[in-house]
């Protein structure tokens, strides 16, 4: 009987997870740099899961983030870039992987006008990012990505037309990639430059009522307040009974 109940619980959870990273989300008025999605929820979704994800690094703030994650024994997923600002910190990618965290693709340039000019331009950007990562990690093992601005961003329409994201999502899956957005946004990389307390409030607001949380954070040079907030963010989710995992581990529950 216990096995039957457990199997039923996992079936419900996996259905929710599948909807979270493979569904067409309604666009919101949220700025594209902090694009949110509506999480699928279920009354019987157990266990409660949270994925901490960090975009746009590595940077000087990546190391203290890794130290906090190590101290708290919490895994995370890093959607990395290879911009000029990242160049001196690229060796940290090896440290991220060595610590047991997940490396995933974000963008080589993070310049919307370039990466969304066409589908070919997007995949050239991904190729450049993979090449930048080759000295530090097994790029063949990386099969997750996050679209800059999210999978339903509208800024891409200016450069590649209204249908470009739909095409890119289909192409990503054809190429063997998983892609994922988020449903909890720290807003730590916005122009308002929130302090640590506000970052935590933003997360608590978005996480409320969700049993599966994918949290958007950043590990750029400008997000020192994220480092300050991280211990309290982790404490909050622990107090709420969440289990921490990478996005790949979440998908593996299927």
Regions found by a protein language model. Give the residues of each.
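Terminal accessory/targeting
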Residues: 1-51, 67-76, 135, 183, ...
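Short secondary-structure boundary micro-motifs
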Residues: 2-3, 99, 175
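Active-site beta->alpha N-cap acidic-glycine motif
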Residues: 22-142, 252-253
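Catalytic domains of cell-wall/extracellular-matrix polysaccharide-remodeling enzymes
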Residues: 110-216, 220-238, 242-243, 249-253
């Amino acid at each position: 009987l216990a096995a039957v109940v457990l199997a039923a619980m996992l079936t419900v959870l996996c259905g929710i997870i599948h909807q979270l990273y493979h569904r067409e989300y309604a666009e919101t008025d949220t700025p594209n740099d902090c694009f949110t999605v509506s999480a699928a929820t279920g009354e019987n979704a157990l266990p409660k899961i949270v994925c901490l994800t960090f975009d746009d690094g590595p940077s000087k703030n990546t190391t203290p983030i890794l130290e906090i994650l190590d101290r708290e024994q919490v895994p995370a997923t890093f959607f990395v870039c290879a911009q000029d600002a990242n160049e001196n910190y690229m060796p940290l990618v090896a440290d991220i992987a060595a610590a047991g965290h997940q490396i995933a693709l974000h963008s080589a340039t993070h310049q919307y006008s370039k990466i969304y000019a066409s589908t070919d331009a997007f995949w050239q950007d991904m190729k450049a990012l993979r090449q930048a990562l080759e000295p530090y990690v097994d790029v063949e093992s990386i099969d997750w990505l996050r679209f800059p601005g999210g999978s339903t961003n509208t800024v891409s329409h200016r450069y590649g037309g209204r249908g470009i994201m739909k095409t890119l999502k289909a192409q990503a899956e054809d190429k063997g990639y998983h892609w994922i957005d988020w449903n909890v946004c720290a807003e730590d990389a916005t122009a308002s430059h929130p302090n640590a307390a506000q970052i935590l409030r933003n997360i608590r607001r978005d996480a409320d009522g969700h049993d599966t949380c994918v949290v958007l954070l950043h590990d750029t040079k400008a997000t020192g307040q994220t480092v300050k907030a991280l211990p309290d963010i982790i404490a909050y989710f622990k107090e709420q009974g969440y289990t921490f995992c990478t996005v790949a581990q979440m998908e593996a529950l299927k």
